[in-house]
Each structure stands twice: as structure tokens, then as C-alpha cells.
A protein has these predicted regions:
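Structural signature of hydrophobic alpha-helical transmembrane segments
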Residues: 3-4, 171-179, 232-240, 287-291
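Membrane-interfacial segments
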Residues: 4-5, 55, 59, 92-100, ...
Length: 344
């Protein structure tokens, strides 16, 4: 998952915040939110590619919107949402020296060593040339995905079940990433045995079961009850098309996945007559699973914050991610609506 790269950043953010006497909750909570909001602006995310497929000309919606059209709206709107959430986070909570609970905690020498110990720096560290090679190989794979997504003519064409069309972008992403991974493994002196011990790999394996399993189950449920859902929501969405964003937000929380929510709800929106431009504008509404802190990146964020300032509240819903998430999504959807009115 594209958002899971944040696991490598959490320990760094926590250490720097503590060294600078900054309340770790301020940067860490919004970092977790930002990692998921960026999925809507990533050319290699399944959510964006799913939207490209749904809005393709073959779905009979008139004008087709491609990858670049979506990114032209999604990148500035998502970035603005993240910036607004970050600005709000600058002053959230008490400073560490004024936080009675934190000060009481560090009076225990063992707790103080646990919270402030273990900080390491990579400054003045010389990395092997293979580290730079692997970075550029990864960027090259992303560039290839963007290029293939921008121009269908570059993709091979296949005929499946008497229907001819270019290779799916879902498959293109998988192929490019697997090729890049194979090249890095062979050329950059990676020790295969150490891959399974990495934090990102472990988090990805957890995500496969905790996210993919839930998404698959919920997708099965929604597909079975789609006629009832369409009938129930049709009148609301047709009367007020903007309520599509609320429906998408709710379903996203239920399925814990942006891609699964879009796959289930975006085609329904088109079938109900929602304008394709609105689907692009409200793409950030597919990130609704911050409402309850059950997503792996949120749980990891809480675990990496040794100070305990990033947490789940007594009433569950009053957790560290709820307000940054709401600010980010509402801002992104609002700006997305304005940009689609101007640019598309």
C-alpha cells in the first residue's frame, strides 16, 4: 500500500520532536493523516487507478477523464488539506513542559530513559552507492506508471471475452513495481533474508489481512445488497449530488480502504447520474477510516510515540487523528470542487 511508507518516518518524527521539546502528537498524528490523504494524489495508488478505470470512456459517461486530469485536481487539493491540518496541529495540546501527565511520567528514571533514549542520527553518514541506485530505480518505475497511465496507446491491447482494451492500470502498477523490486534485489546488494525483518514489510503483511480481508468481505456484502443500497441512496444523491461525498466517506470507514470504497460507490454514483467531475472533486472523501483509530498506520503511530501524547481518548472517537483528518478531508473536497469547476 502506498500509504504504508509512513512507518519508516514515525520513529524519526518522534525522535526529532522529543529532541526539540515538541509535543510528538503535533507532527505524528498529522503525518499519519497525510500518508493516507496522499493516496488520492499518487499515480501508483490503487485508489487513483481505480478511479481512472471507473471514469474511462468505455463506461458510457461521455467525456473521459484520464490520470493526468485526476492528478491535476487531486494533488493541489490533497496537499492543501494536509497543509491546513498541519497548521492546525502546530498549537494542539499542551507543550511538554506544561503537560502535567507527561511531567509526572518522566519523573520515573526508567520511563525518562525509555522516552528520551535511543535517539540516533544519520547526519554525516555515508550511504553506499547502491542506496542511491535503488531510489532512482523506484522513481523510474513511478515515472513509467505515470507515462503508461497518461497515454493508453503505450499499453498493449488484449481481447478478453470478446472485448478489446488496453492492459489495466491495476496490472501495470503491479508489473512495474515488481520489476523495480526485482532489479533492486539483483543489482543493489540487498540481503533477501533481511527483507522480512523490515518494519514496512511487517506492516504490509499486517495490512494484507487487516485491510484486504475486511475490504474483500465488505465488497462481497455491498455487491450482494447493491440494488437495495442504490434504491435507498438514489433519491438523496439525485436530489443533492454533493451527498455522494458523505456516502463515500461513510462506506470508506466501513471497508477501511479508499480503493474498495471507490470501487463500490463511484460506479453507483455514475449510475445515479452524479457528474463525473464531482467524483473527481470528492475523491478525498474516500479517506474516512480515520474516524475510528483502527487503521494500521494510526495504531503504529500511537505505538511509535514513546511520550504517549498520540493516543486514543476515553470515548474512543476523541483520538489524536479525528480533527486533522476532518480538516484535511473537508478542505480537500472543497478545493477539489472549486478546481474542477475551473479546470475541467
Amino acid at each position: 500500500g502506498t500509504g504504508h511508507v509512513v512507518y519508516t518516518m514515525f520513529p524519526i518524527i518522534a525522535d526529532i520532536a522529543l529532541q526539540k521539546n515538541i509535543r510528538p502528537e503535533r507532527p505524528m498524528a498529522v503525518a499519519s493523516v497525510a500518508s493516507q490523504m496522499a493516496i488520492c494524489a499518487s499515480p501508483v495508488s490503487v485508489a487513483v487507478v481505480s478511479m481512472v478505470s471507473i471514469l474511462a470512456a468505455g463506461h458510457g459517461i461521455g467525456q473521459a477523464y484520464g490520470l493526468l486530469d485526476i492528478l491535476m485536481i487531486a494533488i493541489p487539493s490533497s496537499l492543501t488539506g494536509v497543509v491546513m491540518a498541519a497548521l492546525w496541529s502546530l498549537r494542539r495540546g499542551k507543550d511538554l513542559d506544561k503537560d502535567e501527565e507527561f511531567q509526572a511520567k518522566i519523573k520515573d528514571p526508567a520511563q525518562r530513559d525509555f522516552i528520551y533514549g535511543g535517539g540516533e542520527t544519520l547526519l554525516n553518514t555515508k550511504f553506499p552507492k547502491e542506496a542511491y541506485w535503488s531510489t532512482w530505480i523506484f522513481f523510474a518505475a513511478i515515472a513509467a506508471v505515470v507515462l503508461l497511465g497518461a497515454d493508453e496507446a503505450l499499453r498493449p491491447v488484449f481481447t478478453i471475452k470478446e472485448k478489446t482494451g488496453p492492459l489495466s492500470m491495476n496490472l501495470v502498477i503491479q508489473m512495474m513495481m515488481l520489476i523495480a523490486g526485482a532489479i533492486i534485489l539483483m543489482r543493489c546488494k540487498v540481503k533477501p533474508g533481511e527483507i522480512a525483518n523490515g518494519a514496512v514489510f511487517k506492516a504490509g503483511m499486517v495490512a494484507i489481512f487487516s485491510v484486504f480481508g475486511v475490504a474483500w468481505m465488505s465488497e462481497t456484502f455491498f455487491q450482494a445488497h447493491m440494488p437495495l443500497l442504490k434504491e435507498t441512496l438514489a433519491h438523496v444523491v439525485q436530489a443533492q449530488p454533493w451527498t455522494y461525498a458523505l456516502v463515500l466517506f461513510l462506506i470508506s470507514k466501513l471497508v477501511n480502504s479508499q480503493a474498495a470504497a471507490l470501487t463500490a460507490i463511484a460506479p453507483m454514483g455514475l449510475a445515479l447520474g452524479v457528474e463525473p467531475k464531482l467524483l473527481i472533486a470528492f475523491l478525498p472523501a474516500s479517506y474516512g477510516y480515520f474516524v475510528l483509530p483502527t487503521y494500521p498506520s494510526d495504531l503504529a503511530c500511537i505505538g511509535f510515540d514513546r511520550s504517549g501524547t498520540t493516543r486514543i481518548g476515553k470515548f474512543i472517537i476523541n483520538h489524536s487523528f479525528i480533527i486533522p483528518g476532518l480538516i484535511g478531508v473537508v478542505t480537500s473536497c472543497t478545493l477539489g470542487f472549486i478546481l474542477t469547476s475551473i479546470l475541467l
